[in-house]
Amino acid sequence: MIRKLILPALLLIAGSAQAGDEAGHAHASDADSHLATLGDIRLVHAWTRATDRGEALVFMEIEHNGHKAATLTGGASGIADGVNLVAFRSRDGNAGYVTLPDLTIAPGTEMVLQPEGVALRLTGLDEPLVEDQSFDMEVAFDLGHAQVIVQIEAPNATRHSHAGHAH
């Protein structure tokens, strides 16, 4: 019985190790769906809120450990018509998100995409986002693209349910 379980486990580990960076695209590993990498850039805890509306905001931590600036330009997802970089702004009593063309992240810094801050906005959602499910999303940088797994949290969530532990 144990022998029957070991072979599939080894095949899963080998497949995950081969999934590395191909043609400028990085993929989240099966063993750690909360982390994706693109060279010296780490994307941690991608999440959004459950919604039945046509758009949603995606949040995450972006750690840039490289020596050259990286520019976040947007993204793509099979569940949405578009993915735009946005920032929260409150002016003259009006609050909301405005589109940003891109965002440069300095080497050795961390950028936190969070509610009422900077986020990636999914527009034209094909279907509702259901709590405790997840979906794939590509995050685009000038240096390449990283594939993240976005966890869908409660409609009123203010952070990822696993935020605060190390990866």
Task: Outline where the language-model segments fall.
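Sec-dependent signal peptide recognition
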Residues: 2-8
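Domain-length cofactor-binding catalytic modules of enzymes
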Residues: 10-12
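N-terminal signal peptide c-region/cleavage motif recognized by signal peptidases
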Residues: 14-16
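Compact, glycine-rich, soluble single-domain proteins
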Residues: 20-167
